[in-house]
Amino acid sequence: MTAMNPHIDRTGQRERQLAWLTVATPAVGTVVALVLAWHQGIGWLEIGALASMYLLTALGVEVGMHRFFSHHAFKAGPVITAFFGIAGSMAAQGPILFWAATHRQHHAFTDKEGDPHSPRPLKAGFIGNIQGWWHAHLGWLFSLRKQNWSQFVPDLLRDRLIMQINQRYYLWIILGLLLPSLACGLITRSWEGALSGLLWGCLLYTSPSPRDKRQ
């Protein structure tokens, strides 16, 4: 039996930990928000924070990550490119290269061997269907995969601006946390408002996932 490369093993562990954090944070945020809403109610501040950040990141994912970076459905200058790259990254669905490479690979092998999030069951019967459903929705995020960027996104690798945005992925996530927190904190002039903005504008919203795009 061949031992796994320690570097690859550590990288896989970090990726799985990040995947759990990405999946668990909105789930926990939703529970906390619902409990607080039940006991304290919600106002226009919370609704505004949720709607604003959802629309911003959904635009970044739907138009940016999907139509622009993955499919080149239109052309854009550096300002628009940066806007879509940053807005899409704030959704915390992965850096530009990861998102586009995964989506292009999905289209190249749709529901076949090589599709990173195919729902086709590996086993027959009810259990196999459940496993396929789980893998298509969340399980694929925890699978250790060799990076395929040079095969599926060579055009993005040659773009200096896109590479700079991609390399600062975690900075954009932090920016997505700070924007609604600062805005709500300044509006209310209170730490409570800032925390409310953090919860409703960051930890609650979820944007459409790459697996949902079929075109």
Question: Model-found features: residue ranges?
Answer:
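Non-catalytic, topology-defining segments of multipass membrane proteins
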Residues: 1-204
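Single conserved hydrophobic/aromatic residue that forms the stacking wall/gate
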Residues: 205-215
